[in-house]
């Protein structure tokens, strides 16, 4: 008869006792020091770490400890993922794969893993993920329902949480998520949008801090009337950036929102940028002839890098390789972001079967079509693709 021993944490020896059994082969038991368990758990996939919480209360406590969650996030930052999501069959599905597989010159195929599914009643477009968490990008605009729920989710652990209703007398609400690495704090910025003839601007700016117990929106002051675009946000070193237009002058600009101080700053743009990117830790922007998309007919794009000291943009032009036309063809793609040192990822707007993304090595100026397998045979759905996604085991509180 095999006798099971319970798992327990020995407070005296600070060691985790692993389940053992006693039988005809004798006793087989052992303890692992907590620091060794932390080392092991910080290296497993986030999906596995989330499941390990069910092993026991002691494992759950260990996996929720700030030291382990911070160590996991630090190590996960060195192994970023490609993240893909779309809505189909009554749910939103999330898929990911290690990013380095896209850069593999010996393979044109990447198999993704299904992380989680979210019920369809969470109607949303999604913001760029920040340190492992994602947020709805807007309420009502996509769903056309005033009762559409906004949410925050962690694709790696499968956890999602509703956000409080936004206090608003307007119809449309747009949101962004940011992270302050110093205080290790997530915040969600939202604003209501007024859209009248010749009168476009954001009003009722509000912010919500995660991990503070009861979630609550707080009103903010913003000194410049502007209209934010529904795309192109990025968070770099505790500063959230998003594209916008001044309400009165119709001038293009980039708005920066500092997570710690909760204040807005405004950076003039010389032209309308298609999207914002993280370029080696600096704010970058992309501009091309067709706002929002590119296809095989494009011959190049402009890369804009912000000079932080002078608050000016530095422009460079990248000419696409001749084979771009044949590889991309008539597929409409958008600039997802930069991985590695100088590798660009492009993605279609709509899911196809088979589904492909495109990898441009800016150093060698070579373009590769990469097939993504594992997302199923569905096609025709709007698809959201992200790079530099970091797995995170932190619970949404």
From Swiss-Prot:
CDD domains: F-box_AtFBW1-like. It comes from Arabidopsis thaliana (Mouse-ear cress). This is F-box protein At3g49450. Residues 26-75 form the F-box domain. Pfam families: F-box, FBA_3. InterPro entries: F-box-assoc_dom_typ3, F-box-assoc_interact_dom, F-box-like_dom_sf, F-box_dom. SMART domains: FBOX. PANTHER family: BNAA05G37150D PROTEIN-RELATED (PTHR31111), F-BOX ASSOCIATED UBIQUITINATION EFFECTOR FAMILY PROTEIN-RELATED (PTHR31111:SF132).
């Amino acid at each position: 008869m095999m006798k099971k021993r319970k798992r327990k944490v020995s407070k005296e020896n600070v060691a985790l006792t692993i389940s053992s059994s006693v039988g005809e082969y004798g006793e087989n038991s052992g303890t692992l020091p907590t620091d060794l368990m932390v080392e092991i758990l910080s290296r497993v996939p986030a999906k596995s770490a989330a499941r390990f919480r069910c092993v026991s209360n002691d494992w759950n406590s260990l996996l929720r400890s700030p030291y382990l969650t911070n160590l996991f996030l630090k190590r996960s930052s060195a192994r970023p993922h490609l993240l893909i999501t779309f809505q189909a069959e009554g749910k939103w599905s999330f898929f990911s794969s290690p990013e380095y597989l896209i850069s593999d010159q010996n393979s044109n195929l990447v198999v993704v893993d299904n992380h989680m599914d979210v019920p369809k009643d969470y109607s949303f477009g999604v913001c760029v993920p920040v340190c492992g968490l994602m947020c709805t990008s807007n309420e009502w605009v996509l769903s056309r329902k005033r009762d559409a729920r906004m949410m925050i989710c962690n694709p790696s652990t499968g956890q999602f949480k509703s956000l409080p209703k936004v206090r608003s007398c307007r119809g449309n609400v747009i949101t962004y998520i940011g992270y302050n690495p110093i205080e290790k704090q997530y915040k969600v910025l939202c604003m209501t949008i007024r859209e009248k003839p010749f009168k476009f601007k954001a009003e009722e700016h509000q912010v919500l801090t995660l991990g503070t117990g009861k979630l609550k929106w707080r009103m903010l002051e913003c000194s410049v009337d502007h209209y934010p675009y529904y795309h192109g946000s990025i968070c770099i070193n505790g500063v959230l950036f998003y594209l916008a237009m001044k309400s009165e002058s119709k001038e293009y600009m980039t708005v920066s929102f500092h997570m710690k101080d909760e204040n807005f700053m405004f950076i003039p743009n010389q032209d309308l940028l298609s999207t914002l990117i993280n370029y080696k830790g600096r704010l970058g922007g992309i501009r091309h002839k067709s706002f929002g998309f590119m296809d095989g007919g494009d011959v190049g794009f402009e890369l804009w890098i912000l000079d932080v000291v002078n608050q000016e943009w530095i422009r460079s032009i990248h000419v696409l390789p001749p084979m771009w036309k044949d590889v991309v063809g008539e597929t409409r793609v958008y600039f997802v972001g930069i991985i590695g040192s100088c590798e660009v990822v492009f993605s279609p707007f709509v899911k196809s079967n088979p589904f492909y993304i495109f990898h441009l090595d800016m150093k060698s100026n070579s373009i590769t079509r990469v097939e993504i397998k594992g997302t199923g045979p569905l096609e025709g759905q709007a698809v959201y693709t992200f790079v530099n996604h970091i797995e995170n085991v932190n619970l949404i509180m």
